[in-house]
Amino acid sequence: MTKRERIIQSVLVKVPKDAINQFLSHGSTPISVLFLAALVGVLAGLVGTYFEIAVHFVSETRTEWLKSEIGHLLPLWLAAILISAALAFVGYFLVHRFAPEAAGSGIPEIEGAMDNIRPVRWWRVIPVKFFGGMGALGSGMVLGREGPTVQMGGAVGRMVTDIFRVKDDDTRHSLLASGAAGGLAAAFNAPLAGIMFVVEEMRPQFRYSLISIRAVIISAVMANIVFRAINGQDAVITMPQYQPPELKALWLFLLLGGLFGVFGVLFNKLVTVAQDAFVALHKNDRKRYLITGTCLGGIFGLLLLYVPELTGGGIHLIPDVTNGNYSVSLLVMLFVGRVLTTLICFGSGAPGGIFAPMLALGTLFGYAFGATAKILLPDLPIEPGMFAIAGMGALFAATVRAPITGILLVIEMTNNYYLILPLIITSLGAVICAQICGGKPIYSQLLHRTIKNDKLRQQDLPEQQNS
């Protein structure tokens, strides 16, 4: 064995004795944590960016097949059903067979892992979420890629700690949180929102310290640099740039926030109802689960042909709405329709998130509210698009209960920095109203539901064995 081979072997195999382990063991040297946080950010950025590219590729390929090859062999409606059903089947099968924790958004799983009550099987979650998400999102279901990107980012953070054999619990925790921040930063091209999401939304689980906050910041920045290097530096959503509204119009934003606060509480409860309904339908039986998911995929494949506005994550719909392409009545119908399709898709347990669908809902209702206000108050100088942007932040704030994150997220996604004041008013109004109504943050609600169901399953196992 040559000297070079001996060195490589010592690095890869005898990790406790190598230079990397010594580097990490210097009394929790901050530079070591920050170095690993940067690595986590780069990897989370790569995973998140290429996940977006992969989902877009699947969607475009599906469309091309319908236009050319399969569309000529079969009736168009049948081809659309079969393609989307097959894509959905892949997503549901991978989740149920290899990583049930990859169902849904995945953010509650990361929060549970930060509390040491949920495992992070990164070697399963990352591939299942990546390829399963490609299938589910590519089929046209109303799901977002942002939640999966956060879960994969957190899994990348745990992967790095395992590969480098990091033993310190605080460091492992910091890198898990750093991965989640990097995932969100890469998903939305929003580094500030990625940082604040961990600090604000995950505040019950996040261990605040100077080192952990620095690690989160570095990871989010590195992930965003990777995203911009691959996808460019444009905002995720292209829309008009608005000037700040006049002060006498700000009360309308507060009213809009109150409406979203009430709806946010109702929406969170309906999510749980939808999940329970699907569990009662398939009873965690794999065959029933796959049949349910495959049928849903086929239905949304058909909707893609005739009512595409009711399909997909909804990011593509936001510019059309803010450009004034829909009447108020049509916006209300689309809002109601997308509420139903969002609940169906997310409640079914498909590997996809709810971030993007919620932003689309906020846009639809917000623009309808603004257009109605402009008709009723013609002397007030307002633009309906302002309320669409405010609605995005308000619904996020009401459901996730993270107003600062929602404000930063919308500003970074749309580049509408002049609307920060109406965004603050709308988001805070939504949060306060949601608290008065007694609602709970959606991800905490989903985590508690997961833990409760796991306990019930564990209690049922001895009874089944005894019987």
From Swiss-Prot:
It is a multi-pass membrane protein. Gene3D superfamilies: Clc chloride channel (1.10.3080.10). Pfam families: Voltage_CLC. It comes from the Bacteria. A motif (Selectivity filter part_1) lies at residues 104-108. It is found in: Cell inner membrane. GO terms for cellular component: plasma membrane. It catalyses: 2 chloride(in) + H(+)(out) = 2 chloride(out) + H(+)(in). A motif (Selectivity filter part_3) lies at residues 353-357. Keywords: Antiport, Cell inner membrane, Cell membrane, Chloride, Ion transport, Membrane, Transmembrane, Transmembrane helix, Transport. A motif (Selectivity filter part_2) lies at residues 144-148. Proton-coupled chloride transporter. Functions as antiport system and exchanges two chloride ions for 1 proton. Probably acts as an electrical shunt for an outwardly-directed proton pump that is linked to amino acid decarboxylation, as part of the extreme acid resistance (XAR) response. PANTHER family: CHLORIDE CHANNEL PROTEIN. This is H(+)/Cl(-) exchange transporter ClcA. The gene is clcA.
